Amino acid sequence: MSKKIRTEAVDYLFEAILSLKDKEECYTFFEDICTINELLSLSQRFEVAKMLREQKTYLEIAEKTGASTATISRVNRSLNYGNDGYDMGFERISLDEDEE
């Protein structure tokens, strides 16, 4: 059975996230809504995706991030067959850095 992601509750959560104004507000919000391990797992996946885009090996990624090869494989599958969400994030971060 496939879970439906597009729900009113998820929309409401995303609206709250989109309303955050700066990094400090993000820390405040995410420290309340996520456990430390959940937040660290999300950030680990993002770092893994960045390193995969930089053509790092699974061994290099595992050593630097502590991610399992299963996690690295899942992130790699998302990069190759997903909705391009990671790339959208990377592009926007890059644009923000270019403007500074």
Regions found by a protein language model. Name each.
Residues R53-E60, R92-E100:
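Long, compositionally biased
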Residues E60-T65, I72:
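Short alpha-helical "recognition helix" segments of helix-turn-helix
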Residues E25-Q44:
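Short, Lys/Arg-enriched anionic-surface-contact patches
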Residues L20-E24, I36, Q55:
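Residues at alpha-helix boundaries and the short loops/turns that link adjacent helices
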Residues M1-L20:
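General nucleic-acid-binding
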Residues T69-D96:
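C-terminal structural segments of small proteins and small subunits
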Residues L42-K56:
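Short, amphipathic alpha-helical "recognition" segments used to contact nucleic acids or chromatin
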Residues I17-K21, Y27, E100:
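Active-site anion-handling motifs in enzyme catalytic cores
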